[in-house]
Amino acid sequence: MNKNNVIDSLFNIIEDRKDKPIEGSYTGYLFEKGLDKILKKVGEESSEVIIAAKNEDEEELIKEICDLTYHIMVLMVEKQIKLDGIEKELEKRREKICNKKNERKTIEKL
């Protein structure tokens, strides 16, 4: 299975769990609990990635990055953001000649 197919397949499964919940599904549980729970998990997993990177354990870091990626994808489905939207934005950023930090848009509201 190529790299994109793994990501696409997982994303499709997450979308399916949102549309057709399965009893006992962790993904379904996250959607049932709602945005606050999903965001809490994204925050937790982000912290775990940072700790794993600091510990310099590649296997642990890979696992934590996978956990974070999964929870980000759950958030994307919850907020109705498609993978192709992310791909298009990454492509636009890749095409920029200069992407200095001081030239980025500022966050206007939190």
Swiss-Prot record:
It catalyses: 1-(5-phospho-beta-D-ribosyl)-ATP + H2O = 1-(5-phospho-beta-D-ribosyl)-5'-AMP + diphosphate + H(+). One of its GO terms (biological process) is L-histidine biosynthetic process. GO terms for cellular component: cytoplasm. Pathway: Amino-acid biosynthesis; L-histidine biosynthesis; L-histidine from 5-phospho-alpha-D-ribose 1-diphosphate: step 2/9. Its EC number is 3.6.1.31. GO terms for molecular function: ATP binding; phosphoribosyl-ATP diphosphatase activity. This is Phosphoribosyl-ATP pyrophosphatase. The gene is hisE.
